[in-house]
Amino acid sequence: MKIIEFAYPNVPINEEQISLCLGFFDGIHLGHQTIIKKAKKEGYKVGVLTFDNSPAFVTGIINENLCLTSIADKAEYLSDMDVDFLYLMHFDKEATNITKDQFIHEVLKPLNPVKIFCGDDFTFGARGEGNAKYLSMYMPVEVVPLQKMDGVKIASRDIKKLIQTHRIQKANELLGRPYRINGLVVDGQHQGRSIDFPTANLKLDYPYVFPDFGVYMGYAEVYGKRYKAIINVGTHPTVIPLYKPIIEVHIIGFEGNIYGKDIFVEFIDYMRSEKKFDSVLELKEQLEKDREKAKNTLK
């Protein structure tokens, strides 16, 4: 997959016609995947036009810039789907002034789309005045209706809410894969090591959606190898409580120094709430139970 980064008005010119998918594509969830699959059926090479920053955040529609996927994540997932081109447009305050007609004639047309594919909620141009109906006056457009699974909307906003309320399994179903974050392992207080339960403290590489406080089972990818893991999100109230929540990962079966290394962490299921134990011994006993459950449950 070729990645083309640009900022308006320096839009790349594509010589060959392509099927072009439009949207922010946060999460590359099942709804997004449906759009891309429909585009691939046209028989042309497929491009995805998205943005380096959330238009909803830049324009003030939402207050928090929390995402399900980083730019690197999106590139990986789109490449896995055999997308040919990823057009990454810089989106800042100035970009909010691009009119709907400028977007059509000066951004889309140079990319040479034979057909546009988008969700039914896609808007573009200053104040979001452009929509699929308006766009169809200038080029062929296929609108992919909002998808649902078991009555739940497959939408980035709804998936974020699921993650923030412990419902990781349902979020993963809508994503079509486990929710994954990437972070740098940083030095911590070494409290886990003192009870033979070492953890990797993560400094997130991107403003990912933070799961609600609690203990989760999942996987950690270290040096390209996938390990079972238990993940604590919170302030570890039993041992030197923190003011700011962190993500700590106990990587089952791994021994080694990974400080300063980037690792991937996948959340598979919620196990229990975070709680303050009466003693460190009681905490250790519970952690051992958590580890055993994760080892036996995860494949």
Please identify what each model-predicted range represents:
Residues 5, 9-70:
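N-terminal catalytic cores of NTP/NDP-binding nucleotidyl/phosphoryl-transfer enzymes
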Residues 29, 78, 116, 171, ...:
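Residue-level signal for inorganic ion chemistry
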Residues 45-47, 84-85, 114-115, 140:
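Residues at the starts of beta-strands that form the adenosine-phosphate
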Residues 66-74, 96-104:
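Glycine-rich, highly charged phosphate/nucleotide-binding loops
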Residues 97-199, 223, 278-282:
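Classical nucleotidyltransferase
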Residues 188-299:
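Phosphate/ribose-recognition catalytic cores of enzymes acting on nucleotide-derived substrates
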